[in-house]
């Protein structure tokens, strides 16, 4: 019987080492980039910020959370343990649909309690909508919603945080809401 041919062994360690170095450089580079990229951005006093077609002037001391903000869709501001979230989206229905959905999400999904009834609000700029307060074991907040039927758009504003210092955060939130209008160019 003929003897089987002997295969010349391939050197696999250089290729494996190159793959390992490429993975290490990729992961290390991403970790380096992540550690050098700030997660928040301070906002200049009096600077108007826009999200979608909504624009407002942030209260002093609030910073933008870069990782939770999406250009043209949402803007998250924070100050201490309190958050101020503005989201905009297209909406072709009536004003009650998204508000009821948000209440259900808070009550059933997040186990929060709605405090009182939904009420109407009007700002000095003429911005009007609906609002309600909510609370849970660790946080409390207020939710505002504006539906612009002509533009077919929805703006939702949510301010929440720990009960400690909430009155000051709500005063800041009301001042930001008072400065808001829906005339930002898109």
Where are each of the predicted segments found?
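Short, well-ordered beta-strand elements
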Residues: 86-87, 152-162
């Amino acid at each position: 019987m003929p003897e089987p041919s002997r295969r010349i062994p391939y050197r696999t360690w250089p290729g494996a080492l190159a793959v390992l170095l490429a993975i290490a450089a990729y992961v290390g580079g991403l970790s380096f980039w992540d550690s050098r990229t700030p997660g928040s951005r301070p906002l200049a006093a009096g600077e108007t910020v826009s999200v979608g077609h909504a624009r407002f002037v942030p209260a002093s001391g609030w910073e933008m959370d870069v990782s939770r903000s999406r250009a043209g869709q949402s803007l998250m501001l924070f100050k201490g343990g309190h958050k101020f979230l503005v989201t905009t989206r297209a909406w072709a229905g009536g004003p009650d649909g998204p508000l009821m959905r948000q209440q259900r999400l808070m009550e059933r999904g997040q186990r929060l309690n709605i405090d009182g009834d939904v009420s109407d609000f009007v700002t000095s700029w003429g911005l009007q909508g609906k609002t309600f307060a909510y609370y849970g074991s660790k946080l409390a907040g207020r939710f505002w919603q504006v539906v612009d039927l002509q533009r077919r758009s929805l703006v939702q504003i949510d301010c929440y945080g720990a009960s400690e210092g909430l009155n000051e955060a709500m005063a800041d939130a009301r001042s930001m809401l008072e400065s808001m209008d829906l005339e930002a160019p898109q």
